[in-house]
A protein has these predicted regions:
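Short, solvent-exposed polar/charged micro-motifs at secondary-structure junctions
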Residues: 65-66, 152, 180-181
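Conserved thiamine diphosphate
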Residues: 120-174, 198-200
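Conformationally flexible catalytic loops at phosphate/diphosphate-handling active centers
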Residues: 165-207
Length: 209
């Protein structure tokens, strides 16, 4: 796929950008206001084009642990959720940080506390920037103000996560996730081969044949 100009929602842009980055896997669970990420990936069917795995897990806890397993093999794995769903993922995120594994987490925030509302919110700032889960760690946090930044931060988030071997988060809110803007989608990048992963990620748990 070449560079392309489209009109789309921020959540849809996340899905398109993940495919075009060459992501290996997305594992998620529906929750308003970010469900379009998973819905768009299901519609685009990247497993038939790039070989990207897309799976709706049985829960948020299962989804983040699937990301954990993918990240341990050096794959570009990601998930997305919204505020209470991200809270359920915190133990898995903490384990990713402890294991020094790269991963991308997208939080399209909604109001809280508790189950909260489906209205947009920016209330998860401290949870995201101060670590969230137990232990002494900090995420790399990218906060988009536009749909274009939602797109650009997918590649940047993955690149920073692999550079520093730590999870990174795109911290958006329901407004950016739902509003539509013109977006310049980047050209398609190929997924890395096993040999490239072995060279670039010597820490990865890959089978040697």
């Amino acid at each position: 796929m070449e560079e392309e100009v489209r009109l789309m929602k921020g959540n849809e842009a996340i899905a398109h950008a993940a495919i075009r980055y060459g992501a290996d896997g997305y594992f998620g669970y529906p929750i308003t206001p970010q469900s379009e990420v998973l819905e768009t990936l299901a519609e685009l069917r990247p497993w038939e084009t790039t070989g990207m795995t897309v799976l709706q897990a049985e829960s948020e806890v299962a989804a983040i642990n699937m990301v954990y397993g993918g990240a341990a093999t050096g794959r570009a794995a990601m998930t997305s959720s919204s505020s209470p769903g991200v809270s359920l993922k915190q133990e898995g995120i903490s384990y990713l940080a402890a294991s020094e594994l790269p991963a991308l987490i997208v939080n399209v925030m909604r109001g809280g506390p508790g189950l909260g509302t489906i209205q947009p919110s920016q209330a998860d700032y401290f949870q995201a920037t101060k670590g969230g889960g137990h232990g002494d760690y900090h995420l790399i946090v990218l906060a988009p103000a536009t749909v274009q930044e939602m797109t650009d931060f997918v590649g940047l988030g993955f690149d920073l996560a692999f550079k520093y071997r730590t999870p990174s988060m795109i911290l958006a809110d329901g407004v950016v996730g739902q509003m539509m803007e013109k977006v310049v989608l980047p050209p398609q990048r190929p997924r890395r081969t096993d040999e490239q992963i072995r060279q670039q990620c010597p820490w990865a748990c890959l089978l040697y044949t």
